[in-house]
């Protein structure tokens, strides 16, 4: 059965998106990403080195023809900053599918939703396909979609915390109301967290720190790949209805 993740008319067979930061070196980055099976990788614009061809860059290790680069605006604190960064990325790198991150403060890195919404409106109006990092607030998620977002990326917990999904109910509401893909972003710490997100009906999961900072990143990347697949299959299969009584696996007929 074909079950592709579709974002802005692009089809991907993997529902796992991975980040490229926090690894020990580029070699480890490549090995982990290959093990994850991901086709989309998020990159901070400073890591793709779009202005200095002499300096070592991620593109030297991860072929942009093989992977879809999803440039993000990490550590932007205003809509204007984010828009300027992505305009430069499109001009030099040709990237049109982008991830918008506009932080409100530096300790917990929660998104500034007012500035995020502003950035989405501007970028969508300029022809970008925008995937915004956002709070798990159903109302704001709907407004982002109505403003032109091609996918919604609510956090599970603060970026890099590994705390897992803190508000599963809100995620389910966001999934139910959305007509664009919902991709859980930030806070996924374990493969079981990824399974929970996918079983809840989310369309994908973005993971970076829990792979990069695992004791064995390549093994964790493989685990996350299988977790996302298992959760998706479980969601499509449809879980049994829970009940408040026991039900034996075999009946008692024919027992002497």
Swiss-Prot record:
UniProt keyword annotation of Transferase present: yes
Chain segments annotated as coiled-coil in the UniProt record: none
InterPro entries found in the cross-reference section: Aldolase_TIM (IPR013785), Thiazole_synthase_ThiG (IPR033983), ThiG (IPR008867)
A molecular function GO annotation: thiazole synthase activity
Catalytic activity: [ThiS sulfur-carrier protein]-C-terminal-Gly-aminoethanethioate + 2-iminoacetate + 1-deoxy-D-xylulose 5-phosphate = [ThiS sulfur-carrier protein]-C-terminal Gly-Gly + 2-[(2R,5Z)-2-carboxy-4-methylthiazol-5(2H)-ylidene]ethyl phosphate + 2 H2O + H(+)
Bilayer-crossing regions: none
Residues annotated as the enzyme's active site: 99
Entry keyword set: Cytoplasm, Schiff base, Thiamine biosynthesis, Transferase
Compartments where found: Cytoplasm
Gene Ontology biological-process annotations: thiamine diphosphate biosynthetic process
One cellular component term from this protein's GO annotations in UniProt: cytoplasm
Pathways per UniProt: Cofactor biosynthesis; thiamine diphosphate biosynthesis
EC number(s) given by UniProt: 2.8.1.10
Pfam families, per the entry: ThiG
Quaternary assembly: Homotetramer. Forms heterodimers with either ThiH or ThiS.
Family annotation (HAMAP family): ThiG
Function: Catalyzes the rearrangement of 1-deoxy-D-xylulose 5-phosphate (DXP) to produce the thiazole phosphate moiety of thiamine. Sulfur is provided by the thiocarboxylate moiety of the carrier protein ThiS. In vitro, sulfur can be provided by H(2)S.
Family stated for the protein in its record: Belongs to the ThiG family.
PANTHER family hit by this protein: THIAZOLE SYNTHASE
Protein name: Thiazole synthase
UniProt source species: Neorickettsia sennetsu (strain ATCC VR-367 / Miyayama) (Ehrlichia sennetsu)
Gene: thiG
